[in-house]
């Protein structure tokens, strides 16, 4: 068995440090944290906002397209970086392979653009519908620009309200009429 080298000591110190840090981060909150229980303590929240509605919210497929585009172009960058580090060794065969790879990705990008996968803005949808798009006018109405185009875009909970309405923080359109009838 050989003697322990300085590199071995560095690895041992790193493992000990990581273990200590993990144990520290797991035990200190248990020791210093509060122990109170209650209904409000068990309620989930995100970024300081109490959640409203169910967790089964349908997301637009455009979010998945963003993720897929990221993966595709991230992998493209990875392959091109690997090729660029070995460009002298692979020669013309490697260059030809990379050109075919990039052309293939460009064809996929043109196809995605042609089917409308890259038109995400509400203005693009309005142009396709034949509406006149007002951008940057002094009388710009943000509510009109960001309105829902159809009920399919509006995710509702079982009560038929949007999640903010079911939490009671936003009044529905029928609420003021009901309150005026009671008076």
From Swiss-Prot:
Biological source species: Acinetobacter baumannii (strain AYE)
Protein name in the entry: NADH-quinone oxidoreductase subunit A
The reaction(s) this protein catalyses: a quinone + NADH + 5 H(+)(in) = a quinol + NAD(+) + 4 H(+)(out)
Chain positions covered by the region annotation Disordered: 159-183
Gene Ontology MF: a single term: NADH dehydrogenase (ubiquinone) activity
Keyword Metal-binding among UniProt keywords: no
Quaternary structure note: NDH-1 is composed of 14 different subunits. Subunits NuoA, H, J, K, L, M, N constitute the membrane sector of the complex.
InterPro entries: NAD(P)H_OxRDtase_bac/plastid, NADH_UbQ/plastoQ_OxRdtase_su3, NDAH_ubi_oxred_su3_sf
Domain of life: Bacteria
GO CC terms in record: NADH dehydrogenase complex; plasma membrane
Localization: Cell inner membrane
The protein's Enzyme Commission number: 7.1.1.-
Transmembrane parts of this sequence: 11-31, 63-83, 98-118
Family label: Belongs to the complex I subunit 3 family.
Transmembrane is among the record's keywords: yes
Protein's membrane topology: Multi-pass membrane protein
Broad class of the protein's primary localization: membrane
Functional description taken from the UniProt entry: NDH-1 shuttles electrons from NADH, via FMN and iron-sulfur (Fe-S) centers, to quinones in the respiratory chain. The immediate electron acceptor for the enzyme in this species is believed to be ubiquinone. Couples the redox reaction to proton translocation (for every two electrons transferred, four hydrogen ions are translocated across the cytoplasmic membrane), and thus conserves the redox energy in a proton gradient.
Keywords, in A-Z order: Cell inner membrane, Cell membrane, Membrane, NAD, Quinone, Translocase, Transmembrane, Transmembrane helix, Transport, Ubiquinone
């Amino acid at each position: 068995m050989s003697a322990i080298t300085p590199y071995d000591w560095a690895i041992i110190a790193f493992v000990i440090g990581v273990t200590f840090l993990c144990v520290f981060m797991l035990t200190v909150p248990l020791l210093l944290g509060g122990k109170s229980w209650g209904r409000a303590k068990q309620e989930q929240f995100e970024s300081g906002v109490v959640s409203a509605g169910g967790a089964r919210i349908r997301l637009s497929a455009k979010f998945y397209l963003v993720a897929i585009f990221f993966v595709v172009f991230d992998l493209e960058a990875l392959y091109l970086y690997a090729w660029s580090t070995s460009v002298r060794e692979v020669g013309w065969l490697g260059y030809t392979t990379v050109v075919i790879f990039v052309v293939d990705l460009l064809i996929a990008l043109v196809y995605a653009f042609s089917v409308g996968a890259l038109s995400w803005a509400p203005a693009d949808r309005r142009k396709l519908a034949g509406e006149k798009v007002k951008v940057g006018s002094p009388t710009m109405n943000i509510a009109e620009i960001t309105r829902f185009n159809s009920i399919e875009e509006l995710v509702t909970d079982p009560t038929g309200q949007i999640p903010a309405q079911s939490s009671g923080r936003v009044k529905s359109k029928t609420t003021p009429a009901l309150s005026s009838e009671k008076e």
